[in-house]
């Protein structure tokens, strides 16, 4: 059993005392609708940009999760006034005039990449930043390197290239830097969010391809909505950000498309029907490209003006290979439902997910193998063969990884007796995940 980092769990984690969950197959056809929580990606971007602005911004539909909790707590320690009232969050930005402080960022990858540049724009101040055990194993050097080129003073406190670290406020001079997005697009977004506060324009020359490049567009669109002046080509080879401070805004945040995919997969897997009440296909969140994957597997998808609906089929179709590079957070979702297809499914171009909260390729291969499913693991993906998963004697480990937990839970809606350790890890992005499953008729036992 893999121990989780309890310090990274926030008060917004609802399953603090729950060690395992057991899921049970549906007794009847799934036919329901849900309202999804807000987007984690948009929430943390909007919180930090609002804090960088001067005066009051309002966010509606903010996600309340571990990652957003640590973002809010860090911003408060920096002197930002934030008030969360139900679905509405007000932020009084201070233009980057941060208080010196020691900060803890939990396991929040977005916060780890976005906050660093925001601190670097300050003309004075000192900060030490600690991260969770898992986040401290994920490299930050690509972003630190370009921030140093632009004038930032950053020192690693233990291991070179990883959290924890300290930063001294020098401001950013501006200029041209080269940055790769092949490991994570968040390095690029982290620099972009800070760039309007540099002394001169910041030009980013992107080296190679960008994994999940749509998230960079998401960052750019949000920056522009807060008044940033940005120029870029559609291939994102060169991005220029001009010195223009953000202006306060009132923003309605979309629902989380990544979370949506688990519920769409649930309907696909159980020959059910589900309607997502607060998400449309017009979203720029890349994970919703999974809709075309579900259609490829035989499902019927309705893209409404205010909803998305999916209806499953009695036999999912397999027998294909697919690059999941642009929606790599859903590689595990597809792997989890792949055993129930009528042919093998090969997932490629996701080597970078080996460096997330867990080595996701290795972990999902291990779990499926334990369940009796044949898998072939390779450097940038895996092939999953059809089969009937069989419950294991001991609970499956979730490896303190929310995407592992949510993906494996789908199998539990088809196979009796599947148990998962540490279900509370879902609070990183969707604290209410298991409650939403129960709302849809899935029986969940908490132990």
Swiss-Prot record:
User: Could you state a single Gene Ontology molecular function term?
Assistant: 3-phosphoshikimate 1-carboxyvinyltransferase activity
Q: Which residues are involved in binding 3-phosphoshikimate?
A: 40-41, 45, 184-186, 329, 356
Question: Which of this chain's residues are annotated to bind phosphoenolpyruvate?
Answer: 40, 109, 138, 186, 360, 403, 428
Cellular location of this protein? Cytoplasm
Pathway, according to UniProt? Metabolic intermediate biosynthesis; chorismate biosynthesis; chorismate from D-erythrose 4-phosphate and phosphoenolpyruvate: step 6/7
Query: Transferase: present as a keyword of the record?
Result: yes
Q: Read off the CDD domains from this record.
A: EPSP_synthase
The family annotation for this protein states: Belongs to the EPSP synthase family.
State how it assembles: Monomer.
This chain's protein is named 3-phosphoshikimate 1-carboxyvinyltransferase 2
Which organism is the protein's source?
Halalkalibacterium halodurans (strain ATCC BAA-125 / DSM 18197 / FERM 7344 / JCM 9153 / C-125) (Bacillus halodurans)
Taxonomy, top ranks, is: Bacteria, Bacillati, Bacillota, Bacilli, Bacillales
Question: What gene codes for this chain?
Answer: aroA2
